[in-house]
Design a protein with these regions (language model features):
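Alpha-helical structural signal in soluble globular domains
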Residues: 40, 82-86, 134, 194-207, ...
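Alpha-helical recognition/docking segments in bacterial nutrient-uptake
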Residues: 57-170, 233-238
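N-terminal helix-turn-helix DNA-binding module of bacterial transcription factors
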Residues: 1-56, 332
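Hinge/beta->alpha junction and helix N-cap segments in small-molecule ligand-binding domains
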Residues: 65-78, 96-104, 157-167, 183-230, ...
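Periplasmic-binding protein-like
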Residues: 117-123, 181-184, 215, 237-247, ...
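Flexible loop/turn connectors
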Residues: 228-332
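Glycine-rich phosphate-binding loop signature in dinucleotide/nucleotide-binding domains
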Residues: 44, 114-116, 175-177, 232-239, ...
């Protein structure tokens, strides 16, 4: 005779409803009791249905939407590793999905949903408001990471870009006693617009006019920012005595260009980056940078999504992760 949920409930002296919720991976049962139910079911030789087997292969999908942007930087690697590590602690595996430019998002989502994920984490760094609507229509929990859109109906975990950029700019003003310059990305992602807001807020609060800032626009990678800054220096464009940069890659490329043209860092020009990548402490000179706690950010994103999966009632929230400034040797 086959073992039933009632048999398991009788052995554990709990309700059959609790057993059913656990075996069907539904909320309402503690993790400890859920584990005990599965252990007992296995000991008694319980035969799982195909649906149960599928639902108990717990899986979270992580979606990257590519345009003229590749998620290959150390920032996204550290963030993704943190998410995967946290999910494994709770018995979930992670599947990564890539939706490339010109792909039909609706069709790609249909393919993803065939894998029956319990929830989705969406890297929204380069997304637009019009693309978010596809994810609002889904019946499973979706968390938006590294972006925020008021129209999105799920949770969002973002960086406090404005305050981070403002703190970096204020540091330059305090140390250099002049209006800082800005080496900004040619991209216009929401994160970068927020960093620009923080930069300009800091210089205005210090009594400078926005037009006083010397601004250079570069392509946001180490090699491209190096090449762009070499051209700017060789054209003899005006240079500031200190700069805030949109990210560490830009800052490191700029430092290389300045040093190759005989400009000393920080004696002649001070520089601050953003992201505090692991390699930023190894460049010459070690880079002062706005630290984004990437491991913590990934953990918070994973925890919040799992909470939503387990909960019967959901109230969307926006979580802003604060930054701190790591002082090294690139500011005099």
């Amino acid at each position: 005779m086959s073992v039933t949920a009632k048999d398991i409930a009788k052995k554990l002296n709990i309700s059959a409803a609790s057993v059913s919720m656990a075996l069907n991976n539904k909320p309402g049962v503690s993790d400890e009791l859920r584990a005990k139910i599965f252990d007992t079911a296995n000991e008694m030789g319980f035969q799982y249905s195909k649906k149960m087997l599928r639902k108990n292969h717990k899986m979270i999908g992580v979606i990257f939407i590519h345009k003229n942007f590749i998620f290959d930087s150390a920032f996204f690697s550290e963030l993704g590793n943190s998410i995967e590590y946290r999910l494994k602690e709770y018995g979930y595996r992670l599947n990564a999905y890539h939706i490339h430019e010109h792909c039909d998002i609706s069709l790609e989502l249909q393919k993803i949903l065939k894998d029956d994920p319990d929830g989705l984490i969406l890297f929204g760094t380069i997304m637009t408001d019009s693309e978010i609507r596809y994810f609002n229509q889904l019946s499973l929990p979706v968390l938006l990471l590294d972006a925020y859109f008021p129209s999105f109906t799920g949770d969002s975990v973002v960086i406090n870009n404005v305050d981070g950029a403002r703190a970096a700019t204020e540091c330059l003003i305090d140390h250099c006693k002049v209006c800082p310059g800005y080496i900004r990305s040619s991209s216009t992602f929401p994160n970068l617009r927020e960093r620009a807001d923080g930069f300009y807020k800091a210089i205005r609060d210090a009594g400078y006019h926005s037009s006083q800032a010397i601004v250079h626009e570069v392509i946001a990678s180490t090699e491209n920012s190096y090449a762009d800054m070499i051209e700017i220096i060789d054209r003899k464009e005006p240079l500031a005595s200190c700069y805030f940069c949109d990210n560490d890659e830009i800052a490191i490329g700029a430092i290389r260009a300045f040093r190759e043209r005989g400009i000393r860092i920080p004696e002649d020009i001070s520089i601050i980056g953003f992201d505090n990548m692991s390699y930023s402490s190894y460049v010459t000179p070690p880079l002062t940078s706005v630290n984004v706690p990437k491991a913590y950010m990934g953990k918070i994103a994973a925890d919040r999504l799992l909470d939503t999966i387990r909960s019967e009632v959901h109230y969307p929230i926006k979580i802003a992760i604060n930054t701190d400034l790591v002082i090294r040797k690139s500011v005099k």
